[in-house]
Amino acid sequence: MTVVVDTNVLPGMFTTGHGYRPIADAWFDGIFVWAVSTEILLEYEEVLVQLKGHAMARRILALIERVGALQGNLHRVSPSFSFRTIPTDLNDDKFADCAIIADADHIITSDKHFSRLVGSGYKPQPIALEKFITRFLTPA
């Protein structure tokens, strides 16, 4: 399974004890492939610097790169086309473009703008992080 992680999910993923942490743990364990683009990594960096400071942002991004290299579960894509699936928020469009190019199954997000992907004909579908955890990471 391949997913794109929206920026609103990222900071909590790398916080011990946070409700979003199971997503990072599952990725560390190789349960899913995380698709990213350079634009997305730059946005991650910007938000992490604002929320956690430069040093912690660098550590988290380095961890993402290292785990991805070791596990082979970080899929980098370079979208050369914009599908304009989210015209109401062009900043979110980069996540949809990445997901479409990577043939991702889901975009993990709490952002309602991504609901435009539902029924759009594109494979990637938005999924709330709680639903992702319940559906894919909780033992049956």
Where are these regions (language model features)?
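Short, well-structured N-terminal submotif of metal-dependent ribonuclease cores
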Residues: 1-36
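A residue-level structural signature of the nucleotidyltransferase/glycosyltransferase Rossmann-like core
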Residues: 2, 33, 106-107, 124
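Alpha-helix capping/helix-boundary segments
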Residues: 9-10, 40, 113-114
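Short, flexible helix/strand-to-coil boundary loops that buttress conserved ligand/catalytic motifs
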Residues: 14, 48, 118-121
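PIN-domain endoribonuclease scaffold, especially VapC-family toxins
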Residues: 26-82
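A short acidic, often aromatic-flanked loop/helix-cap motif at beta-alpha or helix-coil junctions
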Residues: 42-43, 81-86, 131-137
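Active-site neighborhoods of divalent-metal-dependent phosphate/nucleic-acid chemistry enzymes
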Residues: 71-107, 112, 116
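Acidic, PIN/NYN-like endoribonuclease modules and their adjacent C-terminal/linker elements
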Residues: 102-106, 112-140
